[in-house]
Amino acid sequence: MAAAAEPGARTWPGSGSPRLGSPAGSPVLGISGRTRPGSGPERTSRAIGSAAPGHSFRKVTLTKPTFCHLCSDFIWGLAGFLCDVCNFMSHEKCLKQVKTPCTSIAPSLVRVPVAHCFGSLGLYKRKFCVVCRKSLEVPAFRCEVCELHVHPDCVPFACSDCRQCHQDGQQDYDTYHHHWREGNLPSGARCEVCRKTCGSSDVLAGVRCEWCGVQAHSVCSTALAPECTFGRLRSMVLPPSCVRLLSRNFSKMHCFRIPETMVLELGDGDDGVDGSAAIGTGREVLTATESTKQTLKIFDGNDSMRKNQFRLVTVSRLARNEEVMEAALRAYYISEDPKDFQLQALPLSGNAQALGKAGTTEEEASKGSCPRDSVPEAWVIRSLPRTQEILKIYPGWLKVGVAYVSIRVNSQSTARSVVQEVLPLFGQQVEDKERFQLIEVLMSSRQVQRTVLADEEPLLDRLWDIRQTSVRQVSQTRFYVAETRATAPRVSLFVGGLPPGLSPQDYSNLLHEAMATKAAVVSVSHVYSLQGAVILDVTCFAEAERLYMLARDTAVHGRPLTALVLPDVLHTKLPPDCCPLLVFVNPKSGGLKGRELLCSFRKLLNPHQVFELTNGGPLPGFHLFSQVPSFRVLVCGGDGTVGWVLAALEETRRHLACPEPSVAILPLGTGNDLGRVLRWGAGYSGEDPFSVLVSVDEADAVLMDRWTILLDAHEIDSTENNVVETEPPKIVQMNNYCGIGIDAELSLDFHQAREEEPGKFTSRFHNKGVYVRVGLQKISHSRSLHKEIRLQVEQQEVELPSIEGLIFINIPSWGSGADLWGSDNDSRFEKPRIDDGLLEVVGVTGVVHMGQVQGGLRSGIRIAQGSYFRVTLLKATPVQVDGEPWVQAPGHMIISATAPKVHMLRKAKQKPRKAGANRDTRVDTLPAPEGNPL
């Protein structure tokens, strides 16, 4: 099967090379469109030569240091060539090599539109807007899925050319090409072809594939093979061709489970900023101080007037109407002939009641008169009526020899007549043409909307209505002819926060009572009773959207529900060598580093395989991967987060096709003892996320014991009504250590302080300082713990020395890296290992002793070693397990091994690099994450 173009693709006009922000032109779809014989010429560009698609270059005099956007070299001398529309700057010698299309024609080059997923406004240093090519000196937006950066007021003009990370039933591909994104490379990036520097911190230059990370000059990229193999991380990436999600009614934020916490909300179709606000970046020109200039407010159709969104254009007071019209079109990146439009003046009151009538008449326009002081400052761009138009029609299926065909439509043309006319041009010699329909696709940067047109819909009237709404919107609208398919909609919804321990029928009844689910289209497909969660199969898009939005505002038995949209992994299509990585990130760990890692991993991998633990926990991820035959897990968080994920893995193991996945750790917490033992370090300190993933891929698999602690409290006499109360038994899983006494008391005090003021506990250094302060307060504390507990090891009573704390350790790291057991040889005990099936029991005499252990001056008091322990608490005592403290009532604690052992990944030792060895391109050039949300 021939390779298909990457979804979201844009082609390079005039060549078979890939367009920036997209993969190569498809050998299946072809590069250029096909015009029906007899149709007139189509205006697409005002470029200097065919090598500069869409640009309007003019020679300018340089007054400050300037760099070329093609070669990124300094422009020597006083002359350069600047595009009046998109600000592309070039040497004269580079003009003929420019293949980067102008922003004005970029939407027409998108292969398959894929909307972007913009997060919160952030400050991004030394980054550039892909629309106006200017530096991001003010808060801007960044796509959470690809490396697209854009000013807030440039968002409406950004292309819908994001990565397609799943199949959506429209045009599904099995083979992907490079998905090129222009600029914002690190200054040290090197071209894969010529090995010269291709990145720049001064201008938007160079290209990078969003999937494999290969980087090159825009000219050199044409020499690379078009097919993308996903690079160094190919075995870890969940292939987009193996993920299916019918997401018609859901935004990209919903599909990728990204919380909608944007500082500036951009509603559907509301992709701009309030025109009444000051605009500092983008295509607008600020008010000139010269008396010979004037600044005009330019609106684009009814939509921008309704939202009061305008662009500022500064022109000479002696400018002709044609010049003003060209400036207005440039402000909105409109590349059509200015003669097809007119400017209509708006009343000074701003009321648009005379819209379409007031302002410039045809007679006034023909006079060539210039705007004067009496001319209104607010104008709206209007399209002149047309008796016919050239319309591009795109095929809605693969294996077509052309990308589109162009036909002429007039007042008699309808959707049905257009379908019948273009089918033979696409090679579809079918008798039943009624099976095909015409689909209108609006390709905004944040949402791609598809509308099926009625058979009798007049196409010319439809285009007129679009232009009345927004002239720019015409360039973002396409028409596809596609076969009518009765595809049954199916959406999987994860609903968590339900009461645990119920039956499938009970959960179904509970949801029907809480959200009035429709039994005809909603069914419970999976039940996770222990976690109080279900998976709903919904066969109606409208019902799925209603349930999703309603569940987020619904509480059951006082607990709020969690709702997530989950795709389906087509596990039978996974390549044999594919072992995708399931990533869990706790954004609350490590300050803001967790959120930075979330964004980085979404871009390095498929965002469907990256889960935020504060949004549903680990269960949705394990359910998504339940049919994957082989996968690994990366947990980004502290030891408590690791324990959370391992506990969820234990509970869902029987549902997994891969019941024993190996687990790696990226430590973000305070202690990170398990991360230290497995060589992942004392804590994440800003390493390159790509290097982290490579280390996970190269890590060694090891086994680790896990332990089950049964807490069974004694009967408690109630003093109020003389009723005997019994605390129910509780089971806790342990990975690292369990402390009883003084160390648990310190941990409890720290935990309570963090709950009172969580905002202060965002750095590892501050957290350790609080531990020290709490410890100093307990330095004179004496409890005589050995008199308050009893210990049995392997059913044998063990006499305890005089201690204040008793600690059971599973790994050779305690309290942020201290060796509590010690390294001295002792014939009474075996050398500890994390997979030996034994726990070591150690005592400490107080806070001073603990401090000496932390400083490496002493070790703990070795008491016992075994696999089965019984501890009797004679009074209420502080207890902690893996950093989670509480006060345990008098009773029994039984500690025993959990089967089976868990598979962990230990970071491989770094091998010395040979001199002159080539490093992986992605490792060399991937930029570190940056940009802090406001």
Curated annotation (Swiss-Prot):
Q: Where is this motif: LXXLL motif 2?
A: 566-570
- Region listing for Disordered, in residue ranges: 1-50, 905-934
An individual GO BP term: epidermal growth factor receptor signaling pathway
Its subcellular locations are: Cytoplasm; Cytoplasm, Cytosol; Cell membrane; Synapse
What chemistry does it catalyse, as a reaction equation?
Answer: a 1,2-diacyl-sn-glycerol + ATP = a 1,2-diacyl-sn-glycero-3-phosphate + ADP + H(+); a 1-O-alkyl-sn-glycerol + ATP = a 1-O-alkyl-sn-glycero-3-phosphate + ADP + H(+); 1-O-alkyl-2-acyl-sn-glycerol + ATP = 1-O-alkyl-2-acyl-sn-glycero-3-phosphate + ADP + H(+); 1,2-di-(9Z-octadecenoyl)-sn-glycerol + ATP = 1,2-di-(9Z-octadecenoyl)-sn-glycero-3-phosphate + ADP + H(+)
Q: Which Gene3D superfamilies match?
A: 2.60.200.40, 3.30.60.20, Phosphatidylinositol 3-kinase Catalytic Subunit, Chain A, domain 1, Probable inorganic polyphosphate/atp-NAD kinase, domain 1
Which residues belong to any copy of the Ras-associating domain?
387-486
- Cellular-component GO terms for this entry: cytoskeleton; cytosol; endosome; glutamatergic synapse; nuclear matrix; nuclear speck; nucleolus; plasma membrane
**Is rRNA-binding included in the keywords of this UniProt record?**
no
Span(s) of short sequence motif LXXLL motif 1 = 547-551
Class of the enzyme per the UniProt entry, highest EC level: transferase
Q: A single Pfam family, by name?
A: DAGK_acc
Write the record's keywords in alphabetical order, separated by commas: ATP-binding, Cell membrane, Cytoplasm, Cytoskeleton, Kinase, Lipid metabolism, Membrane, Metal-binding, Nucleotide-binding, Nucleus, Phosphoprotein, Repeat, Synapse, Transferase, Zinc, Zinc-finger
Q: Which residues form the DAGKc domain?
A: 576-713
Which tissues is this protein detected in according to the database? Answer: Widely expressed in all brain regions, including the cortex and hippocampus with a specific expression in neuronal cells (at protein level).
Q: How is its activity regulated?
A: Activated by phosphatidylserine.
Q: Which domain of life is it from?
A: Eukaryota
Q: What does this protein do?
A: Diacylglycerol kinase that converts diacylglycerol/DAG into phosphatidic acid/phosphatidate/PA and regulates the respective levels of these two bioactive lipids. Thereby, acts as a central switch between the signaling pathways activated by these second messengers with different cellular targets and opposite effects in numerous biological processes. Within the adrenocorticotropic hormone signaling pathway, produces phosphatidic acid which in turn activates NR5A1 and subsequent steroidogenic gene transcription.
Give the comment on domains: The L-X-X-L-L repeats are both required for binding and phosphatidic acid-mediated activation of the nuclear receptor NR5A1.
PANTHER family according to UniProt: DIACYLGLYCEROL KINASE, DIACYLGLYCEROL KINASE THETA
State the protein's name: Diacylglycerol kinase theta
Q: Which organism is it from?
A: Mus musculus (Mouse)
Q: Its gene?
A: Dgkq
